Swiss-Prot record:
This is Gas vesicle protein A. The gene is gvpA. Its main location: other. PROSITE patterns: GAS_VESICLE_A_1 (PS00234), GAS_VESICLE_A_2 (PS00669). During exponential growth cells contain about 75 gas vesicles measuring 250 x 100 nm. Gas vesicles are cylindrical with conic ends. They collapse by centrifugation (12000 x g for 10 minutes at 4 degrees Celsius); upon resuspension small biconical gas vesicles start to form within 5 minutes. They grow until they are 100 x 100 nm when they start to elongate.
């Protein structure tokens, strides 16, 4: 069985379109401590999505006003 390598290259526009269509969530949590004393804590959640994608997600989890009224 031969291994076939496919060079599928995507343009930047295609990558951005896919990210906005599907959405990306980055959830980060960092804690820096020294000798048991917490010096710095950072918690971040970054969501990158198109408006349509966000509204579908928000309605599904009950974040929109129309979902809360129902």
């Amino acid at each position: 069985m031969a291994v076939e390598k496919i060079n599928a290259s995507s343009s930047l526009a295609e990558v951005v379109d896919r990210i906005l269509d599907k959405g990306v969530v980055v959830d980060a949590w960092v804690r820096v401590s020294l000798v048991g004393i917490e010096l710095l804590a950072v918690e971040a959640r970054v969501v990158v999505a198109g408006v349509d994608t966000y509204l579908k997600y928000a309605e599904a989890v009950g974040l929109t006003a129309s979902a809360q009224a129902a």
